[in-house]
């Protein structure tokens, strides 16, 4: 695993943070160190209680700060406390400054967006909450949300939270089959969707996809449909209800339901190494606190800032840093419906200039794409409002980091390369803009309350000191850690708590350099990270195997200049399947479409190789390690092949890959 000690010189604290008009929340490394010690020490409960009272409104006080352990899988934070996430994110700011912008909605077509005030957001949230109640939704019920990037998606989240319903948001790029599986798994009674979506100038058939999924979801009684484009869509009378018509029939205020701190707030599905998506459950109090804390401290957000996370609300990044984090501290958040290059590669920077955004949080894939298209698209815009630039989804490579720093940040903005996961709920390793010098590619230091431990993979021994590399774990529970996998607590324990008892297992490798900075080294399990999306190799293999001609398949991830990793698939065919070798491209296209249909476009393999056999041990285990080495151009480093049932197949595959290059 080790590539030798990491030696990278740090970059100084950014000028716009250090010498700007706003004093950073954490302004010196000594301040960071003392607070971090306080949050992991014997009296850390005092710090957490103080922050919980500072940042959140509690309807019912808590007396216990935390209980439970990794070993028992019974973690709880502020268990006696009662609160409502919707009230914390909307009502208190609507009462304090009703006309303040809550959401900047930048629609797909330039000029069609608008700003939504906290007062308007409160009315919409309450109206949708009352609509859901009229459908019979009550506390503890699950509502699925399959919406494009419209501002009403935020209202849907918060309407569920307001009445104590659990929202399960499904990314609107997922297929009908993926949506069906998630609705069935979480037992949804209601689906919220739209007639269509818009992205990059193209229509997305959201309602048609939802209808295909609903054919096998008889438990779904009502479908609330947002009119986004107004184009004709399939309709089922008695089940389907237009959003705007339903809102017109209900009261404009809905009192918030007081929820226990440990009541579920949402379920969000993430890829697992077994192929079956995991419904990760986050609870109300601890999750909301960490969302608020991290957006405030990691991005150095102040009350009049305008925060922009360019993710989709269908992923955890959107949940935490479009919806709950910014709104929990009463600042302006951004919903960006389009793509970085529509209608021109200046779209991001036009948006920054137009709304005077102060923080900008995006993925390395987007940064690499825009770098490739040229900095002239950036340089013609006034980006002087920006103070902090963020990166999320995967470690940002140094070339992209330097471009981001020089052309977007003008070498004056802080860059925070953040590490976290769906399961962590919020950022766990990150620079602090006013206190931590950064290194391109390094996640740097743990957030408050996070005590990372790098373990030797085989023995589980803690690797002390610097210049070490191993498996990244976390030593103690923190408030926003996921509490379970929906309907399968044993799988939760087996996945995160059992691999290294006493530690939370992230599934990522990590190194600690000579300065104690943490570097994320990528997945150590069978999960691929494509453009920040975690994809299970087993899930993609399962999609490929449904093709009538496929006998076996092996999927790997390999480095990709644009997307970080790309999906490559090796496929063997059934003997009886009639296949013309001259038409391999046609079959590959069929297989790619199969994956797009079953999972979604983002999971489509970049390359498919039709081969006569796969490298297997005598016991039948497919050696994906060998395939990864061949694709990476490291065929001379395959190591011992004596355990293979047919070592000769390696040469066949090498020739296949070389000829297709």
From Swiss-Prot:
<dbReference type="GO" id="GO:0003987">
    <property type="term" value="F:acetate-CoA ligase activity"/>
</dbReference>
<dbReference type="GO" id="GO:0019427">
    <property type="term" value="P:acetyl-CoA biosynthetic process from acetate"/>
</dbReference>
<dbReference type="InterPro" id="IPR011904">
    <property type="entry name" value="Ac_CoA_lig"/>
</dbReference>
<feature type="binding site">
    <location>
        <position position="534"/>
    </location>
    <ligand>
        <name>ATP</name>
    </ligand>
</feature>
<feature type="binding site">
    <location>
        <begin position="199"/>
        <end position="202"/>
    </location>
    <ligand>
        <name>CoA</name>
    </ligand>
</feature>
<dbReference type="InterPro" id="IPR042099">
    <property type="entry name" value="ANL_N_sf"/>
</dbReference>
<feature type="binding site">
    <location>
        <position position="523"/>
    </location>
    <ligand>
        <name>ATP</name>
    </ligand>
</feature>
<dbReference type="Pfam" id="PF16177">
    <property type="entry name" value="ACAS_N"/>
</dbReference>
<feature type="binding site">
    <location>
        <position position="596"/>
    </location>
    <ligand>
        <name>CoA</name>
    </ligand>
</feature>
<dbReference type="InterPro" id="IPR000873">
    <property type="entry name" value="AMP-dep_synth/lig_dom"/>
</dbReference>
<keyword id="KW-0436">Ligase</keyword>
<feature type="binding site">
    <location>
        <position position="508"/>
    </location>
    <ligand>
        <name>ATP</name>
    </ligand>
</feature>
<dbReference type="InterPro" id="IPR025110">
    <property type="entry name" value="AMP-bd_C"/>
</dbReference>
<dbReference type="Pfam" id="PF00501">
    <property type="entry name" value="AMP-binding"/>
</dbReference>
<keyword id="KW-0067">ATP-binding</keyword>
<dbReference type="GO" id="GO:0005829">
    <property type="term" value="C:cytosol"/>
</dbReference>
<dbReference type="InterPro" id="IPR032387">
    <property type="entry name" value="ACAS_N"/>
</dbReference>
<feature type="binding site">
    <location>
        <position position="531"/>
    </location>
    <ligand>
        <name>CoA</name>
    </ligand>
</feature>
<dbReference type="Pfam" id="PF13193">
    <property type="entry name" value="AMP-binding_C"/>
</dbReference>
<dbReference type="GO" id="GO:0005524">
    <property type="term" value="F:ATP binding"/>
</dbReference>
<comment type="similarity">
    <text>Belongs to the ATP-dependent AMP-binding enzyme family.</text>
</comment>
<dbReference type="GO" id="GO:0016208">
    <property type="term" value="F:AMP binding"/>
</dbReference>
<dbReference type="InterPro" id="IPR045851">
    <property type="entry name" value="AMP-bd_C_sf"/>
</dbReference>
<feature type="binding site">
    <location>
        <begin position="417"/>
        <end position="422"/>
    </location>
    <ligand>
        <name>ATP</name>
    </ligand>
</feature>
<keyword id="KW-0547">Nucleotide-binding</keyword>
<protein>
    <recommendedName>
        <fullName>Acetyl-coenzyme A synthetase</fullName>
        <ecNumber>6.2.1.1</ecNumber>
    </recommendedName>
</protein>
<feature type="binding site">
    <location>
        <begin position="393"/>
        <end position="395"/>
    </location>
    <ligand>
        <name>ATP</name>
    </ligand>
</feature>
<feature type="binding site">
    <location>
        <position position="317"/>
    </location>
    <ligand>
        <name>CoA</name>
    </ligand>
</feature>
<dbReference type="InterPro" id="IPR020845">
    <property type="entry name" value="AMP-binding_CS"/>
</dbReference>
